[in-house]
Amino acid sequence: MESAPAAPDPAASEPGSSGSEAAAGSRETPLTQDTGRKSEAPGAGRRQSYASSSRGISVTKKTHTSQIEIIPCKICGDKSSGIHYGVITCEGCKGFFRRSQQSNATYSCPRQKNCLIDRTSRNRCQHCRLQKCLAVGMSRDAVKFGRMSKKQRDSLYAEVQKHRMQQQQRDHQQQPGEAEPLTPTYNISANGLTELHDDLSTYMDGHTPEGSKADSAVSSFYLDIQPSPDQSGLDINGIKPEPICDYTPASGFFPYCSFTNGETSPTVSMAELEHLAQNISKSHLETCQYLREELQQITWQTFLQEEIENYQNKQREVMWQLCAIKITEAIQYVVEFAKRIDGFMELCQNDQIVLLKAGSLEVVFIRMCRAFDSQNNTVYFDGKYASPDVFKSLGCEDFISFVFEFGKSLCSMHLTEDEIALFSAFVLMSADRSWLQEKVKIEKLQQKIQLALQHVLQKNHREDGILTKLICKVSTLRALCGRHTEKLMAFKAIYPDIVRLHFPPLYKELFTSEFEPAMQIDG
């Protein structure tokens, strides 16, 4: 484990915002300097407008914030809100820098002082985030300089024009006569399809395919997940092999196994189990969209009746697309989680893709229990806690009821983060998936994960039978994902062009049947 990492900045990571810490109504004119005294409202980022003028930029007092917001935050790449402390930044990085200066804080880096700072990772290392703020020129003294010089205005004008031209070029790629797309728009190949193997392999390498990036006005919907410098995890091969524990089914420690190959029953050291559990728990915490504590603090923020009616009045295809985007965001975090699990990247590429294709949504549903409030039957969605009524316009109330029932059931088990992490990894490494090439290798890995899960459950003094209950959830998860596929296919039959043109590519690759041939393996 790392030594003395800085504690996360609780005010710098509000869930549910594309620019996670944006403040509603706290915008400055873009060419004035920020004094850093304005308050920030949590979760306001998702309500920001992404509208931008198509007219030229006039660098005057009348310049609207939306014109400068076309330039992303210089620190994390999120949607900017103006010039703060001399640099174009988002509200979150502005607030983080202000707090760091007010408290004269000293941060430490748990890694090698070269952490990637982007929209998804900015809250993981305060030291590297502050160093990047300083490197790009943020300064408390910047507020003293007043308005920009002509040279600075000209430079800003040129940069805005460059970003606007890039956006217009992307807009012009739309075919003449094509129906106006729902936002966000994703570019696709000429035949409307992409190869699952090639494109998901790109996600496995830690990069978003160029052809699938949304334009800058909506890029916050589609996340670029990149590996951290220490994603290799713990070196299990270096662990000394004592004490040895025989955790075979006959030993009594492993009473709930349903593995088919008895020869794969593992003999592992207690140290190896501890390290595997630590690796998976760490990977889980580093790849969760939101901190659990933050989610629990805002359970009272439910949608008002007027807001619920707004969702209910959305066109069916619009609501489907919104949910597809949200699911895709969550799945990209699951992909990163899988990559960090010891042993996963040693699997052949075919098996990595098969496991993710089959299990990523199941892990999303497991993680949903972190964002579920069983007291009022709501789940965190699009910035607030939503009841089943919010999803009425999808036209699949039975499926939504199934989702909420599962969320409530799993939530009632009061799983810790370690237990959620290990159960997620166990589900992801299912050796009974179709088209796997190295089933025995995956079965051994899954057995070790289940041993680690049982070890953690016993350490936590959980009641007898909880592992059995968890394993029984696997069949429910598969039924839930099967129902999702049924509903998607029914929707696709009515709106094929919406799915083909406007759903996120990764979502289509994972869930639409047209990609199944890519998974067929000779022999």
Curated annotation (Swiss-Prot):
Modified residues (N6-methyllysine): 38
Induction description: In T(H) cells, induced upon antigen receptor ligation in the presence of IL6 and TGB1 (via STAT3). Oscillates diurnally in central nervous system. In liver, Isoform 1 oscillates diurnally but not isoform 4.
Keyword presence, Nucleus: yes
UniProt keyword annotation of NAD present: no
InterPro entries associated with the record: NHR-like_dom_sf (IPR035500), NR_DBD_ROR (IPR044101), Nucl_hrmn_rcpt_lig-bd (IPR000536), Nuclear_hrmn_rcpt (IPR001723), ROR_rcpt (IPR003079), Znf_hrmn_rcpt (IPR001628), Znf_NHR/GATA (IPR013088)
Assembly, per entry: Monomer. Interacts (via the DNA-binding domain) with HIF1A; the interaction enhances HIF1A transcription under hypoxia through increasing protein stability. Interacts with CEBPB; the interaction disrupts the interaction CEBPB:EP300. Interacts with the coactivators NCOA2, PPARGC1A (via LXXLL motif), EP300 and MED1. Interacts with the corepressor NCOR1. Interacts with MAGED1 and CTNNB1. Interacts with CRY1 and PER2. Interacts (via AF-2 motif) with PROX1. Interacts with NRIP1. Isoform 4 interacts (via AF-2 motif) with isoform 1 of FOXP3 (via LXXLL motif).
The protein's role, per its UniProt record: Nuclear receptor that binds DNA as a monomer to ROR response elements (RORE) containing a single core motif half-site 5'-AGGTCA-3' preceded by a short A-T-rich sequence. Key regulator of embryonic development, cellular differentiation, immunity, circadian rhythm as well as lipid, steroid, xenobiotics and glucose metabolism. Considered to have intrinsic transcriptional activity, have some natural ligands like oxysterols that act as agonists (25-hydroxycholesterol) or inverse agonists (7-oxygenated sterols), enhancing or repressing the transcriptional activity, respectively.
Protein name stated in the entry: Nuclear receptor ROR-alpha
Source organism of this protein record: Mus musculus (Mouse)
